[in-house]
A protein has these predicted regions:
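Short linear motifs in intrinsically disordered
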Residues: 1, 69-75, 143-148
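Short amphipathic alpha-helix that is part of the acyltransferase structural core
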Residues: 2-68, 188-197
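A short helix-loop-beta-strand connector motif used in the catalytic cores of GNAT acetyltransferases and
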Residues: 70-83, 100-101
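Cytosolic beta-strand hydrophobic patch enriched in CBS
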Residues: 81-85, 154-156
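Conserved beta-strand in the GNAT
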Residues: 83-98
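Acyl-donor binding region in acyl/amide transferases
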Residues: 101-178
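Hydrophobic secondary-structure block in the mid-to-C-terminal portion of proteins
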Residues: 171-197
Length: 197
């Protein structure tokens, strides 16, 4: 028996057992969609770092993979993320978006995921995702607060069970002012949005 025949038999037997995987990957002769691998190497490495951090976070790790990718792709493409590293290793990250009034309501009250065209729809700055599975949350918040160009930032806080959400707002009157922290329940935040309209 020749080596090629042995190799063919091995491949045939293996593929029979692994056929479900082959069917899950699409047609091998079809090219990948246009722009499928268009991210620069640095951004692909950053995407991997963010996936790693999410997988290590007890709060984030049960998200479906497709949801994680969908949540990270737009801020990655827009460079609206920051990864915090220690000794070269990723330790935390956050993503942000600038939302208009109606998108704030959809995101914070209706809990609708942001569409890519909504990430820069307005001037209201939101931290969309934040993961610090190694205990660096205090350092991340301190670094965010040091940004004197922003006077107000909002984020959604969910309890561990994911059954309740609150809007947390960091606000200062001017670049040198103290930062006030306000927490809004859903109805309180609706009233706040109505006052701002």
């Amino acid at each position: 028996m020749s080596d090629e025949t042995t190799q063919d038999k091995f491949l045939q037997a293996s593929l029979r057992h692994l056929n479900a995987l082959r069917n899950a990957q699409g047609d091998a002769v079809m090219p990948f969609p246009q722009g499928w691998f268009d991210l620069p190497d640095r951004q692909l490495a950053d995407l991997g770092a963010m996936f790693f951090l999410i997988s290590m976070s007890s709060y984030h790790k049960n998200r479906p993979l497709a949801q994680v990718f969908s949540t990270l792709e737009t801020p990655l493409r827009l460079s609206q993320y920051r990864i915090f590293r220690s000794d070269g290793f990723p330790r935390a990250f956050f993503t942000w978006a600038g939302l208009d009034h109606s998108t704030e309501r959809q995101f914070a009250v209706e809990h609708a995921p942001l569409r890519k065209e909504q990430w820069n729809s307005g001037a209201s700055l939101w931290v969309v995702d934040l993961s610090a599975p190694f205990g660096h949350l205090d350092q991340v918040i301190t670094m965010m607060a040091a940004n004197r160009q922003t006077n107000r930032v909002r984020t959604l806080w969910h309890n561990r069970a994911g059954t309740r959400a609150r809007v947390i707002e960091w606000n200062r009157q001017n670049a040198d002012g103290e930062i006030a922290v306000t927490s809004y329940g859903q109805n309180q935040f609706i009233q706040q949005l109505d006052r701002e309209a």
